[in-house]
């Protein structure tokens, strides 16, 4: 496998276009390193989970372009894109990644604010008198 593998991951409003090439484990996220772009260690470990589950950590170089969303949504988008790319690399990875739910797109979105209310569910303060 010497060619570049391309995949897409989405979470909330974030979209990640990811390119996976055989290499030494270098990460480039929007032109920055993984630890620089995602300073929280929990997000970094969540992003690298597909690699650790399939024992491929450090075997691929990753270039990711992320648009939209917040930090958590972007991390989820990268994680899904990595998992999808690893399935393209080797179909036997599918069973393990599916078992841990890494190939399922998280469909939860923000519920819209309703008229006459403070938020999606919250009401304005009720006064009896």
Swiss-Prot record:
Record GO biological process: translation
Domain of life assignment: Bacteria
Keywords: Ribonucleoprotein, Ribosomal protein
Cellular component GO terms held in the UniProt record: cytoplasm; small ribosomal subunit
Pfam families linked: Ribosomal_S9
GO molecular function annotation: RNA binding; structural constituent of ribosome
Family (UniProt): Belongs to the universal ribosomal protein uS9 family.
Protein name per its UniProtKB record: Small ribosomal subunit protein uS9
């Amino acid at each position: 496998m010497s060619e570049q593998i391309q995949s897409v991951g989405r979470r909330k409003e974030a979209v990640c276009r990811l390119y996976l090439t055989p290499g030494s484990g270098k990460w480039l996220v929007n032109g920055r390193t993984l630890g620089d772009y995602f300073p929280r260690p929990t997000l970094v470990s969540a992003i690298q989970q597909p690699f650790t589950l399939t024992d491929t950590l450090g075997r691929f170089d990753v270039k990711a372009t992320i648009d939209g969303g917040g930090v958590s949504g972007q991390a989820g988008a990268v994680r899904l894109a990595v998992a999808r790319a690893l399935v393209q690399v080797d179909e036997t990875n599918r069973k393990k990644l599916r078992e841990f739910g890494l190939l399922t797109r998280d469909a939860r979105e923000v519920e819209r604010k309703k008229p006459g209310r403070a938020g999606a569910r919250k009401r304005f303060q009720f006064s009896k008198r």
